């Protein structure tokens, strides 16, 4: 990548922030979600794909562009699938390969769920009376939801998980990228501006005095 050698005195946090921005730009410009789960017979596409960096150098993300989104549907890939640079013959020494594999092993805690399974489990944990409505009003938001193919893949997998054929899966996605990226914040700001919601607010003093039980009194 690049280093802050051209900006002496810059705080490391500033460099990290822009590095994350660069990763986000690469993710949003290159990543694609496979429409179906990969198999040995039909693996993920790893054809060459270059992204131009701020210093005009080219970064080959042929492997990452399809594997990164796939982790949302198959978290075990973080444990089992090393990028080419950390595979034997990829340019890294044995110590780097072992360190990379060990780090990946620790990235996925036990019980880490795939996105479709997480949605389905969340709905199952709700009252039976509202499950049908929840299956029909699944909202996707955030930057990762903009990955091409993700909404379609999620919809297809949820159709396999829905408990009754009479329940219809419907995914709702804000139309513009900015609306989808900040949908959670926009929704929260609208909710906070409602007079009826302000009656449910709790001050720190109330919480310190009554504890968590005060929440149930205000939001029965």
List where the protein language model places each region.
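C-terminal region/appendage detector
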Residues: 1-220
């Amino acid at each position: 990548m690049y280093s802050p050698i051209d900006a002496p005195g810059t705080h490391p946090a500033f460099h990290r922030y822009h590095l994350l921005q660069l990763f986000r730009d690469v993710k949003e410009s290159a990543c694609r979600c496979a429409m179906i789960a990969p198999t040995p017979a039909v693996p993920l596409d790893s054809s060459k794909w270059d992204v131009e960096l701020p210093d005009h150098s080219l970064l080959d993300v042929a492997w990452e562009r399809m594997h990164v989104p796939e982790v949302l549907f198959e978290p075990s890939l973080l444990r089992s699938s090393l990028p080419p640079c950390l595979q034997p013959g990829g340019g890294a020494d044995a110590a780097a390969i072992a360190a990379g594999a060990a780090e990946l092993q620790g990235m996925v805690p036990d019980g880490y769920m795939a996105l479709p399974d997480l949605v389905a489990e969340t709905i199952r944990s709700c009252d039976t009376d509202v499950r049908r409505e929840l299956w029909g009003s699944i909202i996707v938001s955030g930057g990762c939801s903009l990955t091409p193919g993700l909404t379609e893949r999620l919809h297809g997998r949820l159709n396999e998980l829905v408990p009754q054929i009479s329940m219809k899966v419907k995914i709702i996605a804000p139309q513009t990228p900015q609306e989808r990226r900040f949908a959670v914040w926009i929704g929260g700001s609208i909710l906070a501006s409602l007079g009826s919601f302000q009656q449910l607010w709790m001050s720190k003093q109330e919480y310190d005095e009554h504890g968590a039980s005060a929440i149930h009194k205000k939001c029965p």
